[in-house]
A protein has these predicted regions:
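Juxta-kinase regulatory segment immediately upstream of eukaryotic protein kinase catalytic domains
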Residues: 2-57
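ATP-binding glycine-rich loop module of kinase domains
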Residues: 41-107
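Protein kinase-like catalytic core scaffold
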Residues: 88, 119, 136, 186, ...
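Activation segment
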Residues: 95, 143, 193, 198, ...
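Conserved structural core of kinase catalytic domains
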Residues: 110, 118-167
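Short C-lobe core helix of eukaryotic-like protein kinase catalytic domains
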Residues: 172-179
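Catalytic-loop of the protein kinase fold
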Residues: 179-192, 197
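C-lobe/activation-segment region of protein kinase-like
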Residues: 202-291
Length: 292
């Protein structure tokens, strides 16, 4: 896990100024943190200091995140007086451009008014690391578990059917939601490690870094939706326990992921592109049932 202790709070950035956010990030001195927007405590951000305390226990249920994402308790101080402690996740990016893009995506997802809205972690700030990387700070919500960590818990035995159904349902609900939006997103890395659920088994979006707003009316872009489906199905079907037994069998994947998606293709895509997705799905079902 990355370590960020010793970073101080400086240079507040206004959340509404997202169009100029990239330039402001590049101006942020290395080794400094900037929070987005005004502080809810009613104190100017420039009067605050921050202390980060590593919380390795927050990584439970997020195995594939721990090498890239740091989890912390962030305590805000004013004149050396502690005001509030908040759980944070801090994720590094190679460039400020990708960091800013992800912030914009997270904000857009969380602003959507939808009866089945799936939320993601709210971005709270940016850190400019000493090595030149830019890291995004977001709220951390305990109890969110990635699907791959659920699989890992049963590697030495067998994955119970109800757990396998939960994984397939979570993947379907998440992908279908983002594909069905008026301005849809493709995930572009739809492995089970990037699907998650809350303690109430409600789908939760944990990684938006590769999300792209994609035009389903454009035949040249329709393949991105098909690749999302394909990536997810192969990710599920490739999971095996320590004895080499398949943990999510093809019949379950078809019943709880492919079939419900397939039943709504006519609503998801225009007629001239729906057939492309349907053909892709038929080939996919044949592949996994034959053990390809």
């Amino acid at each position: 896990m990355r370590q960020f202790e010793g970073y101080s709070l400086t240079t507040p950035i206004t959340i509404g100024d997202v169009h100029n956010l990239s330039k402001q990030v590049t101006r942020l001195p290395r080794g400094n943190i900037a929070l987005l927007g005004t502080d809810r405590l009613g104190i100017p951000l420039e009067q605050l200091d921050i202390e980060l305390t590593p919380r390795d226990d927050y990584a439970e249920g997020r195995r594939n995140s721990i090498n890239k994402v740091g989890f912390y308790d962030a305590t805000l101080y004013c004149s050396d007086i502690p005001l509030v402690t908040q759980p944070w996740a801090i994720k590094p990016y190679l460039t400020s451009r990708t960091a800013v893009k992800d912030i914009t995506t997270m904000q857009a997802i969380n602003s959507l008014q939808h009866p089945q809205a799936i939320r993601t972690f709210e971005p709270r700030g940016i850190a400019h690391l000493e090595n030149g990387e830019v890291a995004v700070i977001s709220d951390f919500i305990q109890g969110v578990r990635s699907c791959d960590s659920l699989v890992d818990a049963y590697r030495e035995t067998t994955l119970p059917e109800e757990k396998a159904r939960l994984i397939a349902h979570t993947a379907f609900s998440t992908m279908h939601y983002f594909h069905s939006l008026p301005e849809p997103y493709t995930m572009n890395d739809a492995q089970i490690k990037n699907f998650a659920f809350t303690i109430n088994t409600e789908p939760w979006c944990i990684d938006t870094e590769k999300f792209l707003s994609t035009d389903k009316d454009d035949p040249s872009s329709i393949g991105q939706f098909g690749r999302d489906i394909e990536c997810c199905v192969y990710s599920m079907s490739s999971q095996s326990n320590n004895d080499g037994q398949q943990m999510l069998i093809p019949e379950l994947i078809i019943e709880h992921f492919i079939k419900p998606y397939e039943e709504d293709i006519s609503n998801l895509f225009p007629r001239d592109t729906a057939s492309i997705i349907q053909t892709s799905i038929e080939n996919l079902k044949q592949d996994i049932t034959q053990g390809a």
